[in-house]
Amino acid sequence: MMINEAQAQATAASGRGDGRYPSGLHDGAEISTAAGGQTKAEVPLTMEAVITREYLMLAYQRVVENKGAAELKPWLKKNWRSVRQALIDGNYQPRAIRRMDIPKPDGGVRTLGIPTVVDRLIQQAIAQQLSAIVDKSFSDSSYGFRPGRNAWQAVQQAQRYIRGGKRWVVDMELEKFFDRVDHRLLMTRLARTIKDRRVLRLIRRYLKAEIVRDGQREKRQEGMPQGGPLSPLLSNILLDELDKELERRGHSFCRYTDDCNIYVSSRKAGDHLLKNIRAFVENKLKVNEKKSALARPWERKFLGYSVTWHKQAKLKIALTSVNRLKEKVRSLTTGNRSKSVKATINALTPVLRGWISYFRLTEVRGVLEELDGWIKRKLRCLLWRQWKRPGTRTKNLQRAGLSKDRAMISAYNNHGPWWNSGSSHMNQAIKNAWFSRQGLISLLEQQRQFQC
């Protein structure tokens, strides 16, 4: 499974599931640069180049892959000629974008702006060619939404810095970065690369496109809507200056969109860096003081992972990521007693597969064994609730192999479902092998397979 697929499936439970990279939307922002993986970067970014058949076919494939819209193809056959002419003439007007508020794991909401499928197609075509031109100039320490780069690489590089003796981290997150993007500053940066005024005007129109929610339209003078294929690339262009400044100062860092971890050798160096870099950043952006800190790496998380305190630090799954998986499992195993365990396992399977696929890098496996046991206990608890009456429980325990006396004693105890789900009688009656036959996967075994 590719990293973008794993992240999309894991968002609900991994700690990145706050809407920043929603399934079917953030994948569209990962730039596919051409057939075979490369685009001719020497082609200037003009409107005519953007709407060539080659680029449009690549963009179309990407949009459809990411759950674009089944009706796109017939619509294009009927209307593309007029849209194409409007693009060439420089007077194409993007449609309003749909607002979607996604709850953040730590409270509040993240606002997405979802363009129409046609505008996603056009944005993707622009992003493909623009990426081919600018990506080669980006920092090697920038990992978010770039061809051939992913979160796994960022986490592994962070681990190498820590093992190399940089055992303090300046964990810096920009506050409401996407909501506060200065349009003038971004367009100035883009004008250094894009000389075709039609393309620049179109990007500005996308930045200023109205947001619609509940039939109400909202105009915007700042910010960059998350949810379209252009947004991640534009964020990298805007934050490239920060990367270059950190490189100029000789710092070891990993940045993934607006999350930036800078690794230093001492608290003193970290205090000095935090003060100076905050002054640099806040000339144009704002540091999120609540989420930014100088700390030991094992006290923080980065892209859902953390590390152990050992000299040869090991990657582990951050506690918040574990807790969010548990929240997702709880939501699927409680509240609907009529749903069979088999159906519940079927609903759990894609969540568990996506989660462990993303967290395959963990070197601390004890938590996976604990989670496997906890998930089975949740399912035993579901069974106990579904059996409801002591008589039904007695019959089912007997059918599972318990003696009549033991089944009756167990069924008529005064303890609640959770206590019973962890008791010896339920563990003996509903063995681990039974869950395997129902299709439940083991996180521990899945992770071991990834390591083979």
Task: Report the location of each language-model feature.
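A glycine-rich phosphate-binding loop feature that marks nucleotide/adenosyl-phosphate handling sites
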Residues: 292-300, 347-351, 368-376, 391-400
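Conserved polymerase palm-domain catalytic core
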Residues: 79-101, 105, 137-149, 153-301
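Extended C-terminal regions of large enzymes
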Residues: 387-452
